[in-house]
Amino acid sequence: GSELGKLHKIAAPKYLQNHANFGKQEFSNVKKYAPNSLFDSWLSQNLEYIQPFISSKLPQGLIHADVFSSNVIINKLQDSAVIMDFEEAVKYYRVYDIGMTIIGICGEGVTINFEKVSALLKGYQKELQLLDIEINALQAFTVYAGSAMTFWRHSHFNFIKPDPDFFDHYKSLQTLTDFVKQQPADCFVKLAR
């Protein structure tokens, strides 16, 4: 968490785009290859869920946008971490990056390890204090991040580079995202305070 907080303190280079690569502005592309499908409906419902939490008042900055265990190196003592592979980096909402990290690091199968989430948020807030607007949007942005990664897997393996072995690869992330969405409204707020 503290490494993510340190990253978010770095000024975003001007050349970075200001939206997530597979964010909400791309979700409508599902209509090109799977219109009126169950996945199209799922993605639309999640977009409707997150939309009220998207605000120009949410802080933006340099974000990694893909903090999964494959992009983090932890030393042998497990007291230091390095975030690597910045190919998805953009200037976007900090809380989106926190949500993506919850999906990518704190996800365990089809559930979230809330002890890991708590540790992540504590570490983050040693570097940057979350604003109330970010705390209140955290669950929705975790759903947003999960939806974006699920969309990437679905579109990549079913449309962009179809691969029958991976047609259903998105489903575990979809289930994890649904788990986050089904938590009580104050669950993430309590973890962040």
Please place each PLM-identified region on the residue numbering:
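A cross-family kinase active-site recognition segment
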Residues: G1-L38, Q60, Y170
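Short, mixed-charge aromatic SLiMs
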Residues: E26-A34, L121-L130, F167-A185
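Active-site activation/catalytic loop segments of kinase-like enzymes and analogous catalytic loops
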Residues: V95-Q129, A145-K161
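All-alpha amphipathic helical-bundle segments outside canonical DNA-binding/catalytic cores
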Residues: L130-T142
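Active-site acidic catalytic loop and adjacent metal/ATP-binding pocket
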Residues: E48-Y96
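ATP/Mg2+ or Mg2+-diphosphate-binding catalytic cores
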Residues: M149-R193
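Short acidic/histidine-centered micro-motifs embedded in hydrophobic/aromatic stretches
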Residues: Q45-N46, F141
